[in-house]
A protein has these predicted regions:
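Detector for conserved single-position "signature" residues within domains
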Residues: 1-142
């Protein structure tokens, strides 16, 4: 009679080093370090919780989640919420933040101008690092 390995489904604790999940050289790793270099003060005007109110997710966390999602073809705020909850790469990139889909949708809809200014910063950083040329820059919108 054939013998099979026993599968143990009992509870266990698996420690996870979130930083180790962002593999050097990967898009997520580059995104993590790039967003941390950006001046995100343009997003501060959207928050009015200095004195009262709940603390908000840092714009860097939401921006990382949205940009990683968009890079993978995920544009729905509900799908981004699910990825932040279930996908180890999103969990690592956001520091295990679990923003609600309405928080994500609100961030994207009210931050279009701020995101545009961030894009200009990204181009400047990439140019300074010698990662892009100045001859031609094109984005495939398909």
């Amino acid at each position: 009679m054939a013998r099979y390995k026993v599968i143990d489904m009992s509870p266990r604790l698996l420690p996870v080093d979130l930083d180790a999940q962002l593999v050097p050289g990967s898009f997520a790793h580059a995104l993590h370090h790039l967003v941390d270099q950006l001046d995100l003060c343009a997003f501060d005007a959207h928050y009015r919780n200095d004195e009262t109110g709940a603390t908000a997710y840092a714009p860097s966390v939401l921006l990382k989640a949205v940009l990683l999602a968009y890079s993978q073809g995920i544009v729905s705020s509900r799908c981004i919420e699910r990825a932040c909850r279930d996908n180890v790469l999103f969990i690592a990139l956001t520091g295990d933040a679990k923003p609600h889909f309405t928080t994500i949708a609100d961030f994207v809809s009210r931050s279009r101008d701020a995101i545009a200014s961030v894009f200009a910063q990204v181009l400047a950083i990439l140019g300074k690092e010698g990662l892009i040329g100045r001859e031609m820059f094109a984005i495939d919108g398909v």
